[in-house]
Amino acid sequence: ITSDLHQYGGWTPLTDVLQMTAIDNNVVQATRVLASQAGRTMDSITRDVLAGGTNVIYAPKLSADGTETAVTSRKALDKSCTLTPKLFFQAAAQLGAMNADPIGDSYIAIIHPYAAYDLKTCKEFMEVHKYADPDTMFRGEIGKLGNIRFIETSEAKIWKDDTCPAGLAVFGTLVLGAHAYGVTELEGGGLEHIVKQLGYGDDPLNQRASVGWKGMRAAERLVEQYMVLSLIHISEPTRHSL
């Protein structure tokens, strides 16, 4: 398996006038904003690679009497295609059948807050404060369903293009086993925080400073069978306008 390695980064200028007149420490404030940008950028790169996986479960259409109709594409989803515990039990069964190792003691699902909202109303869902040992939870973890632990993030994949039903968005929830994917750990190419003080470089009047970051990243799916992409449909217009 090969992958192309790319460099990413961002920066913001800080003038001498701003630093003289502002109440806040602008270097600290800029660092906080850019740190968030750096993390979300790297997460998004990995997310988009994983969201291209081929091991997919589509939420079925549900009729008024509870009859299910299979769905085989994002375009075919409708308002009745909602997130249910059954989808995740199916995903866990697939991973188990493929001998996918858990991450710790469970598989891990990456879920958007709007999708998690639907899941939290299910009686089978166990919230983190009910864990026997809540100290072992991951950052962003919201609960557990069977042997799947859920990590909530606004960076979870959302489709709103021509492959989706008109006027509606499709949310993707990833269910992962160990060794499903890999990312780069390049020596000397990790995230770097860069601060340039006033007068650095071509700045004869000491007017320009800057704060920035850069880093290298590549991500690849390693074993398709060790990850499942569950596609769900969210119908509220406010959710489509994200």
Regions found by a protein language model. Give the residues of each.
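Assembly/oligomerization interface modules of large self-assembling protein complexes
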Residues: 1-10
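Solvent-exposed alpha-helices and their adjacent loops that cap or buttress functional pockets
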Residues: 4, 100-103, 203
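Extracellular structured ligand-interaction cores
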Residues: 9, 104-106, 147, 208
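Residues immediately flanking
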Residues: 14-16, 113
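Alpha-helical scaffold segments that mediate packing/assembly in large oligomeric complexes
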Residues: 18-97
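Sequence/fold signature of self-assembling virion shell proteins
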Residues: 70-94, 114-231, 235
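Extended amphipathic alpha-helical segments with heptad-repeat/coiled-coil character used for oligomerization
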Residues: 96, 101-103, 107-112
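A short, hydrophobic C-terminal helix/tail in secreted or cell-surface proteins
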Residues: 234-242
